[in-house]
Amino acid sequence: MGSSGDAWKLKDHPKLPKGKTVAVIVLDGWGEAKPNEFNAIHVAETPVMYSLKNGAPEKWRLIKAHGNAVGLPTEDDMGNSEVGHNALGAGRIFAQGAKLVDLALASGKIYEGEGFKYVKECFEKGTLHLIGLLSDGGVHSRLDQVQLLLKGAAKHGAKRIRVHALTDGRDVLDGSSVGFMETLENSLAQLREKGIDAQVASGGGRMYVTMDRYENDWDVVKRGWDAQVLGEAPHKFKDPVEAVKKLRQEPNANDQYLAPFVIVDDNGKPVAAILDGDAVVTFNFRADRMVMLAKALEYENFDKFDRVRVPKIRYAGMLQYHGELQLPSHYLVSPPEIARHSGEYLVRNGVRTFACSETVKFGHVTFFWNGNRSGYFNEKLEEYVEIPSDSGITFNVKPKMKALEIAERTRDAILSGKFDQVRVNLPNGDMVGHTGDIKATIEACKSADEAVKMILEAIEQVGGIYLVTADHGNAEDMVKRNKKGEPALDKNGNIQILTSHTCEPVPIAIGGPGLAPGVRFRQDLPTGGLANVAATFMNLHGSEAPSDYEPSLIEVVDN
């Protein structure tokens, strides 16, 4: 479809009026699961969300937020905020990073592209460094993809390979880092048997080393830079498996916050720093927690921390992590092309839009919502507000986060009369849920519920409409379960806390004084998912969705 005015024009909905203020509220990490002591949402007794579920059954339902419904390879793949907001904003299902990488590796096309050819130029004399999350969680990376990339790089000429492995414990169980490191070591040993000099060079926990996002805490990236590029870290080991085991024994240590370490040879020297003439590939397929490192690796004018030494390298991402910034400028697999998303359609049809969250999720209601695109479509019709997140802490310390501030700014935007749509992300359930602190997550859910209340009260005052949903599950089930669905126990008989997302469905609710009589959720879309939400809120704005969008979840029944 072209970009002329007529091509972007949305048809009027035959039964629903225009002119109502619509609030689209995304509760991050808020799925639906059986009520029990490990369901932080249930224990929190969230009265607003409870009333939406039980007050009008025809205006509340569950939708899918994982697997194929959000473009991921299998139904075992849990959703995440990136793909969730892509689907919410795009109104269609696009193959996402993990699936694109799978296809490129399976076909071998990854080795035929410009990105791989670019880094391959260093294979003869330099070292290939692979940096990323060592995990099978499938949210940011997958270990099997790394193993295939190692084999493929060796086959295509890499003679010296170093892996800088970040431990997970967030999308997978805490403590799983040891097994992942052992698996990686076995793969590297197989390469060594074939004459390839392949070793782990450094490591550290993802939330303490390298993988910050939205410029929340550059010290995280600096710790990674020091270990990976400079070969400097407070802990030195000869063996990476031993490194992880020993560092996990430190007080309050866990996989997410493992201290940075480097691997050294018999003389105590790092087995590899990143030097002039080397190649670097960041193998995460998810963008948000690679952008800051990509800037440090690629930008000549960089002032976020003292890099000390900036090697002349050839760098490529697994995908391009930021389309507007063209960052990185080289990448192995092209990211999904998402055009004609709902945000641009609404703006081109005169819908004045307000988007708000705090730093840790601000990019989700803007960049990811808008199809991996930064900036405004029309500054005269849009306003994006970022509330600075707390930095330097784990979010269970302050589980309320900035929910109140987000709600206040959104309330003010609604009452100002300047906007036709407000969309917000309330991060509490997800960000605090990732800490594994159930008590704090309960408080987080209460705070998010209170924020929803404030926004809905504003919608009530202006005679508007609300749509409340979530991007994926997390806080609703915070324990690992066995095949019988019972809480799983570790070797010491302790319950294994779950810090990852889930594959549970998420709620969606509609209502408000501006909702036309007879509007209800359809019964003929039992497998509806996040991609159906865009057409739904387009209808609430009084417009039909584009014909290729996933169908709206609502219908209007004449009374």
From Swiss-Prot:
EC number: 5.4.2.12
Binding, Mn(2+) 2: 28, 81, 471-472
One Pfam family cited in the UniProt record for this chain: Metalloenzyme
Catalytic activity: (2R)-2-phosphoglycerate = (2R)-3-phosphoglycerate
Localization of this protein: Cytoplasm
Keywords for the protein's UniProt record, in alphabetical order: Cytoplasm, Glycolysis, Isomerase, Manganese, Metal-binding
Cofactor note: Binds 2 manganese ions per subunit.
Assembly, per entry: Monomer.
PANTHER family: 2,3-BISPHOSPHOGLYCERATE-INDEPENDENT PHOSPHOGLYCERATE MUTASE, 2,3-BISPHOSPHOGLYCERATE-INDEPENDENT PHOSPHOGLYCERATE MUTASE 1
Lineage: Eukaryota, Viridiplantae, Streptophyta, Embryophyta, Tracheophyta
InterPro entries xrefs: Alkaline_phosphatase_core_sf, BPG-indep_PGM_N, Metalloenzyme, PGAM_B_sf, Pgm_bpd_ind
Entry-linked SUPFAM superfamilies: 2,3-Bisphosphoglycerate-independent phosphoglycerate mutase, substrate-binding domain, Alkaline phosphatase-like
The protein, known as: 2,3-bisphosphoglycerate-independent phosphoglycerate mutase
Stated family: Belongs to the BPG-independent phosphoglycerate mutase family.
UniProt keyword Metal-binding present: yes
Cofactor(s) the protein requires to work: Mn(2+)
UniProt record, GO biological process: carbohydrate metabolic process; glucose catabolic process; glycolytic process
TM ranges: none
Chain sites annotated for binding Mn(2+) 1: 430, 434, 501
CDD domains: iPGM (cd16010)
Active-site residues, record numbering mapped to chain: 81 (phosphoserine intermediate)
Pathway linked to the protein: Carbohydrate degradation; glycolysis; pyruvate from D-glyceraldehyde 3-phosphate: step 3/5
GO molecular function term, any single one: manganese ion binding
List of residues binding substrate: 140, 170-171, 206, 213, 286-289, 361
Functional summary from the UniProt entry: Catalyzes the interconversion of 2-phosphoglycerate and 3-phosphoglycerate.
Source species, domain of life: Eukaryota
Tissues where this protein is expressed: Found ubiquitously in germinating seed.
